[in-house]
């Protein structure tokens, strides 16, 4: 039975790094086998991808200077410098002001965007 592949991008996030560190500690202490740790990481990849796909309700707008871009193995990578990221949150239930939307702007010196083919995990 073929299992669909999921990107391992989120293993480099804060929570992903913490999970990898915890699993490494358990392996080095002899409490779990490396094969179990790999299954945990594969499950993590799947759950994060599906959760983001199903539960994301925010919209981002990025404005800045494109510094570098590249495409390899169906993955685009963009480096944007001096950019402003506008985050628009849309909530399912209306907030007290009636609109249900909120917006915030974040200024960053350098932003890396990694865009993957969504068909890989289907």
From Swiss-Prot:
InterPro entries, A to Z: TFIIA_a-hlx (IPR009083), TFIIA_b-brl (IPR009088), TFIIA_gsu (IPR003194), TFIIA_gsu_C (IPR015871), TFIIA_gsu_N (IPR015872)
Gene Ontology cellular component annotations, sorted alphabetically: cytoplasm; nucleus; transcription factor TFIIA complex
Record PTM Phosphoserine, positions in chain: 95, 102
CDD domains per UniProt: TFIIA_gamma_C, TFIIA_gamma_N
GO biological process: positive regulation of transcription by RNA polymerase II; positive regulation of transcription initiation by RNA polymerase II; RNA polymerase II preinitiation complex assembly; transcription initiation at RNA polymerase II promoter
GO molecular function term, any single one: TBP-class protein binding
Effect of residue 41 to D: Decreases ability to interact with Toa1 and TAF11, display mutant growth phenotypes and defects in transcription in vivo
Keywords assigned: Cytoplasm, Nucleus, Phosphoprotein, Transcription, Transcription regulation
Subcellular localization: Cytoplasm; Nucleus
Effect listed in the UniProt record for changing residue 27 to A/K: Decreases ability to interact with TAF11 and support growth on galactose-containing medium. Unable to support cell viability in a strain deleted for TOA2
Pfam family, one: TFIIA_gamma_C
Keyword presence, Thylakoid: no
Subunit structure: TFIIA is a heterodimer composed of the large TOA1 and a small TOA2 subunits. Interacts with TBP. Interacts with TAF11. Interacts with KAP122.
Other information: Present with 3910 molecules/cell in log phase SD medium.
Function: TFIIA is a component of the transcription machinery of RNA polymerase II and plays an important role in transcriptional activation. TFIIA in a complex with TBP mediates transcriptional activity.
Family: Belongs to the TFIIA subunit 2 family.
Protein name, UniProt field: Transcription initiation factor IIA subunit 2
Species for this entry: Saccharomyces cerevisiae (strain ATCC 204508 / S288c) (Baker's yeast)
């Amino acid at each position: 039975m073929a299992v669909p592949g999921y990107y391992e991008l989120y293993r480099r996030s804060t929570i992903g790094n913490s999970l990898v560190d915890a699993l490494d500690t358990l392996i080095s202490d002899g409490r779990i086998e490396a094969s179990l740790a790999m299954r945990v990481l594969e499950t993590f990849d799947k759950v994060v991808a599906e959760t983001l796909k199903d539960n994301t309700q925010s919209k981002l707008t990025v404005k800045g200077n494109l510094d570098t871009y590249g495409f390899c193995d169906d993955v685009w990578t963009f480096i944007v410098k001096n950019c402003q990221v506008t985050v628009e949150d849309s909530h399912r239930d209306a907030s007290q002001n009636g609109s249900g939307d909120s917006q915030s702007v974040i200024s960053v010196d350098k932003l890396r965007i990694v865009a993957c083919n969504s068909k890989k995990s289907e």
